[in-house]
Every structure is written in structure tokens, then in C-alpha cells.
Amino acid sequence: MKIKKFIGTVFLATAIVFTCACSKIDYTASTDNESLPLPSFTDDNSREESNVPPANITTELMKENYKIELKDYKLTKEAEEIVKEGTEIFTDVAPFTGEGYIRLGAFQSVDFLIELPTDQHYNITISACGNGGAVTLTTGGTKLIDSENGKYKRWNGNQHGAYKVHQSRLFTDYNVAPVYLEKGINKITLQTVSGSVYIDSITVTEANVKSDRYEKAGTSIAGDEINYGRLQTMSYLKSIYGKQTLTAQYVTPNTNAEIDVIYRNTGRYPAIRCGDLTYCTKAGASLLSGANENTDIELAKEWAKQGGMVMYSWYWYSPIGKTSLYAKDCEFDVTKAVTDNEKYYTLTEEELKLLLDDGSINEECFKIFCDMDSVASQLKILYNEDIPVLFKPMAVTDNETYWWETDEETYKTLWKMMQIRFEELHELSNLIWICPVTKGRMYPGDDYVDIIGCDIFNNSDNANLQGMLNTDALTLNTKMTALTECFFTPDPDILYRENCMWLWCGALDGKYLINSEGYMTGNYISVSQMKKIYNHELTIARDELSID
């Protein structure tokens, strides 16, 4: 059933497998094209796996009550006052406060010890300048550990984002989202992760984490044709937004390996099964061996029948030249493929072929539309089964990693081409469009997006509040926000404490959870933490969904 939308937005009237034996996982069907070693069993948590899931899940862990005592506070610490004797103090590059400032070279760090009066949230402002380097802020670090990429040593503790310091000879304030800190002495560490940075000072002030942003979001649906299941799903998502977080897990393509591991260890399934349509195009299919049939849509159908929600990303292999996702390896020029001529968006492949033959469009444009049709044909299977799909195509990175990120206008036009073609030619009115952008200039616009996504790869257990606030700002809080990709789901207690209730948290597949034998590694998340996540009152598992 479809509901025609007569105005620009629709306002919602009301506030969605393997067996237990482990089989060998084929990592040639992974969305990561690079060769990565599998994690070894170095964490005893990997041995905690239960052979038989609990028979009944009847109790839920109550959220931990973090003490918050609001109190006015402000303190500025000059960088030159806290460094070791003998550290060079600079005075000649930019106007500064205090007696001077310090320079942090590549991967160097400096610690600020701050005595705080109460347990509460605090804003931290970094006064910095430099030549385009980047600095991270960590709290509570006690020892040095390997960074995620293995290139340097960083402090453990809670990471609160990386901040690009613009090239300038003037100190600029960089504001960190509210951070929960306890009464007493707190260690705040700044460390460069690229280039060099000059640090003048940090300022710590009290903060009050507000929740009104949840109420503003999620009252409109993109597009003109709205499937009833899509409307129902959006209404449900709006009803839980800011109150609970949906569990979500990516799977190795054409398997349910990761979600089976979760069930074995928690007795529950994630609310959302997250797949990837990367192998549905001609170029993507060429990477599959004969033994690896592309059967993921059938698994998604079965998942939906069992009461789960379905999500699909699309990491798009280049349709011409060398098959790759990455701009640095790609011969395909997407700027030649996009067109502003909307009449082409809804033409069939046969009609487009005629235009290609007479020179009205080029091969790049034709191939783009063909790939869209290949993916649409798979999504149509789910449409025919009345299954709503959370659809997240064309992820955006900070460093323009993928070929579709060439420039903002090309990206936005490509998004528009896809959405209009899917909706009008293929009648895919069951898609909930998720735009995974972190840059405002890449955002296609509210008329083309239902939910905004944020991909954050951070190996410390914090809520990533800075990422949520930055993402919210792209749409002025008009769209619900999901943590669409992460190494693992953050602790629900910390999500609650930070008032950072992502709509869902999409934990990555493969080495981030299991090894090649299909067993949990414990390298990123322990069994005990996973049990907490899936049995917590602030999270929703598959058996707790109530969309109907």
C-alpha cells in the first residue's frame, strides 16, 4: 500500500542464520578490500562463549545512576605552565595568553591535571593553531597502548574526538562536546595524530546536557511516494528516539555469522540486521567466487519474517575500469557520470542505451544507471514482501576515501539521481533513506533524507556525543541521528549519562567481532559487555520490537 504525499513533508501522527554450530567464514566476501590479519585469541573473553543460549530472558539490567551535581565552574590552564622543565616555550608566532605557548610534534602529547568541584559534564575548549595538524583529546589515560592503526602509542582512557587545527597564525578555540568528569583530579591529554600543533591553553567550564534536540527531530519523510510500512517504521523510530537505542549488527555478506554469535552468547538477536549490497552490481559480482553466491537478500527476507528490521548499506564498486571502492585506485570519473537532466533519471535501460548510441549520454552515465538498476532489483524483492528497508548508500569520509566523494555537487546530484530513479522508475517506496555524512556541504537536503547517519571508528567506550552534536547541526535537529557504523556498541549506561541516545548503533562485522572460525574474539568487545548491551532496559533487541 502506498500513500501519496501531497505536500513537501508528511507529519507523523504517531510517535522493526546459521545454526549454533560454527562454520568457516569466507572473508573474501568482506566489504573491506584490504588484506587484514585476523585477531588472535589474546583475550580470555573469547573463551566465555556459551554453547547453549539461555532458555529464557526475563530480567533486564537497570541503568547505572551516575551522580550529577550542577555547579558553576571555569578554569583556564596555560600550556606553558604545565610542561616539563626544559620544554621550549614559544612567543613569536601568534598572539597568545599567559607567558607563551608550546608546540606538539607528530604523536607528541601533553597532560593537563584539572581539579574539579563536582561530578558533572564539562565543556573543554582547546586554544590552538598550526599548519593543518590534528589533535585528539583523551580523559583518564593511565598507560600507553597501540593506536588503532598501529602507527603510534596513545593513552588509554576515553577519547573525545580528533580536531583538525586549521592552518593559521592566530589561535582559535576548538570546543569539545560536554564530557562527564568526576570530582577531584582529572587528567586531560592532548595528542597530535597528524602534523604539528601549537597549544596555548585549555579552558574547562560547567555544562548542562540538554535533551530537547530529540523532540525536534523526525517529523518528516523524504520523497513523494510513501509505503505504509515505511510510514509505520518511521513512526516507531520517532517514538523511541531519545529514550532507547536499537541494537544493530553488520554481517559478513551472505551469512548470519555475527548475529548467530550474538545469540549464542546473549540469548537475543539484534533488532537490525545490517547487510551490504556491494556484490549486487556487475563489478561487485565479479569479485565473488563460484562458491559464494549472492544470497544475502534471501537471508534478509527470512530475518524480517522473524520480526527483525532490515538495513542495507551500499559500498559501490566502480562500474568502469579497475574494480575498486577507493578514489586512489579508481579509474572511474564520476563527474562525467552525473547529469542534471532529470528526464534521464526515470528512463529504462533500453531507452538509455539508445541515448548512449546517439551520443546524448556517455558510457559513465549509462553504467551508473545500470548499477542503480541492479541494486534496485534486489531491493524490489524486499518491497514485494512489504519489508521496509533502512537504506544507507554512499558513505562519506573525512578524507574523501571513495570515488563518489569527488566533490559536494557531484555527490548531491548522484544521490538525487538514485533516489528519484528508485522511487519513480522502480517504485521503491519502502526505503528509509539514511545519509551518512559528516560534512554539511555534502548533505543532499531534507527533501532527500529521512535519517542522518554518522560513522565513528573509536576504540574507546564513550558515547561519541561530539559526533552526534556535529551531525545534528547539519540539519538543525530536524532529522533523527544514528551511529550507522562503529567498532562496537557503546555502553548503554554511558549513552544515557551523556544524553547521547543514538537511534541505533551499527557494530561492524568480521574481525571486529568474530574470527575465521566464526567465534567471538573478545578483542573489541567482551562477552560480558555484549550481554549487558542486549539485556539492558535502554536497548532494544529483536524480540522487543513493537512496530505493528
Q: Which residue ranges define each predicted feature?
A:
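C-terminal motif of bacterial Sec signal peptides marking the signal peptidase cleavage site
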Residues: 19-21
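Aromatic-lined carbohydrate-recognition surfaces of secreted/lumenal glycan-active proteins
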Residues: 248-250, 392-394, 398, 415-440, ...
